[in-house]
Regions:
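Extracellular lectin-like interaction modules
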Residues: 1-221
Length: 221
């Protein structure tokens, strides 16, 4: 448990592994493209900001977090990876968004992938998720539901600025509950295509904007 301050990682990186114990880290910083790996097996993981404070762009290189716990991985701060190839973020297990979270793998020269393997949900407050991958892929596993377990996000933004990568969007919400209660922005005028792959999308009262490049296949349901 690293609750009291920032975990500073130097050299190649850090791996935190437990045999089912919980892992709590307030924030993590690096200086030279360090990697961060957290594997709690059956334990819950709670982590705040990772990277994003190094002006040189050589902070945290990549992030991989794994938890099979029913609570899963709680994120309460931004995740920012550095300008180096394979600057990916991989979240294996359920993900809880607590507060404002921006996962940003887009940099000046290299863009990383963002991967989710399971449900993405809010923590019950004002929980906002932004995904910025540039030319990196955003991958949602086949069983991913955004706003799952009847615990919605407040807002959702996916590559709404400048990315041209194709997007495949999983189920949002359930038959009875919205997966996002507020504003939703998916894609931009450079996005190659937006594929709404599932049969169910339940939005709340906020504006929903889905945008793809003109002249392509646009948005498909």
């Amino acid at each position: 448990e690293f609750k009291g301050g920032t975990l500073h990682v130097t050299a190649t990186g850090v791996k935190i592994a437990t045999a089912g114990g919980a892992v709590t880290v307030a924030s993590i910083d690096g200086t030279e493209d360090e990697t961060v790996e957290i594997d709690a097996t059956g334990g819950a993981v709670s982590v705040g900001r990772i990277g994003g404070t190094n002006a040189s762009g050589e902070g945290i290189h990549s992030v991989a977090i794994t938890s099979s716990n029913a609570t899963g991985i709680t994120l309460s701060g931004n995740i920012t990876t550095s300008d180096k190839a394979s600057n990916d973020v991989t979240l294996t297990g359920k993900v809880v968004i607590s507060g404002d979270v921006d996962i940003d793998t887009q940099s000046a020269g290299q863009d990383g992938d963002i991967t989710f393997t399971s449900t993405i949900k809010g923590a019950g407050g004002t929980d906002d998720l932004i995904l910025d991958s540039g030319t990196g892929a955003i991958v949602f596993n086949a069983n991913t539901v955004i706003g799952g377990d009847n615990t919605p996000l407040d807002t959702l933004t996916i590559n709404s600025s400048s990315s041209n990568v194709a997007l495949t969007i999983p189920q949002i919400g359930s038959g009875s509950d919205a997966g996002v209660t507020g504003q939703v922005d998916i894609g931009n005028t450079s996005t190659a295509t937006v594929s709404m792959r599932d049969a169910l999308y339940n939005f709340g009262s906020g504006a929903v904007t889905i945008t793809a490049a003109p002249g392509g296949t646009g948005t498909t349901f």
